[in-house]
């Protein structure tokens, strides 16, 4: 076997390890976020259905589901890559991965692919369960798949950056509570930004999470707060920027190599 094939075999092995890591505790990593999304659906659809203005001829419950799917997808993609790195750093076994002949790019690809698998799988399960509650149309499946893949890749990359930066579990918790959660909840998951005052509509458009959710929702209803092409450009731009930062951090060994 050539050296190149051995390296890619190592990449696949690391990817498989990361997938099995979350799959072995699927009740926590898959079932739990699905249940949380359903609770949001039941509570918010009941409380806000008559108070939040959404798209014409789109019931609020149907409007809510794509947002919940994408929210869970993003959070779980981030959680998978970030938790893997911080646990390895705290436990001290990150050294066994760093000693392998994998390049920083292969290391990134393995962690990212596993994070995307978890995020996409959780989102798909929520979609299947949500069909029992409402008939959800699909207008542009291409946009749905595009933003699901890009969103999981972006948050998977973000998770790797956070995992590299954090030295302790409480730092990671702070990152999730003060960065990921506010960006998620202020991205239009539960409302259309057109229902907001003009100032907050402008503020929302500086949130990259808004473009991921709005583009994803456009695939279901053919309606959105902004053009899906604008959302695509913004999401790709943020993904490329974060990927560049992440690869620079991995290449330099920042907070990974003594």
Regions from the language model: what does each represent?
Residues 1-142, 146-258:
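Hydrophobic transmembrane alpha-helices and immediately adjacent juxtamembrane helices
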